[in-house]
Structure formats: C-alpha cells, structure tokens
C-alpha cells in the first residue's frame, strides 16, 4: 500500500493476480510532490483507478477536500507507462450528460468509471 494525501489518512493499494496489476488511488488530494512515489507504486500496472472528483477549475475552490482532478488523472496517465487510467469518484452533483462530454475529450488510455462497468485485465 501507499499513503495518500487525505486529512485523517488514507492508503492506496495494488493487487497483483495472474500476471496483471491493478492500483486503486482514490481519496487522494494529488500534489506534484507525490508524483515519483505514485509512479513507482503504479509501475507495471495494467489499470490505475484515479480519484477525479473535480475538474481543475473546480479544484481551485476545493483544496483540503481530499480529492484530485480529472486533468491530474490525465497527467498521471501520460507519465505512468502503459497503464490504462480509469477516473472514478465523480462529484455527486455531476450529471451523466456532463460525464459524457468529459469522456469524449479524454485520451485513449483514460476513461471514466460508471455504474455496472466490468473490466477484463
């Protein structure tokens, strides 16, 4: 596991099974000082679940809430090798049509989690 940035504490974890690696990095208020440690933790991951509750613009007024942005998840995906990044933990007030518009703008290796999503690693 890896310690994440959340008031009160939180940990990210990874699971390796059948030669595949999955990392869960939610409830983390991402800071650039974490990048090297998170990249090392997610090294050789096939899938990373990323906390993307906010957009970068929304995050400006949500500092201290313990969540990251969609754009930070994209940045992480650009730096973490071949892993697919799944943005999760969406803002509760975000509407499905807003998520659909966000999804259309994401790079190929990044997508949004949704209810009922099943993935095969």
Task: Please describe what each predicted stretch is.
Residues 4, 115, 121:
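Active-site donor-binding loop signature of nucleotide-sugar glycosyltransferases
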Residues 11-15, 119:
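Short beta-strand scaffold segments in enzyme catalytic cores
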């Amino acid at each position: 596991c890896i310690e994440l940035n959340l008031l009160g504490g939180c940990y990210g974890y990874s699971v390796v099974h059948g030669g595949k690696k999955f990392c869960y990095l939610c409830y983390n208020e991402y800071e650039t000082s974490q990048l090297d440690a998170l990249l090392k933790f997610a090294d050789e991951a096939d899938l990373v679940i990323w906390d993307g509750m906010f957009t970068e613009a929304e995050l400006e007024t949500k500092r201290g809430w313990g969540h990251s942005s969609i754009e930070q998840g994209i940045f992480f995906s650009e730096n973490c090798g071949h892993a697919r990044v799944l943005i999760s933990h969406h803002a509760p007030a975000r509407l499905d049509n807003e998520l659909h518009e966000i999804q259309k703008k994401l790079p190929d290796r990044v997508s949004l989690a949704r209810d009922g999503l099943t993935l095969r690693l």
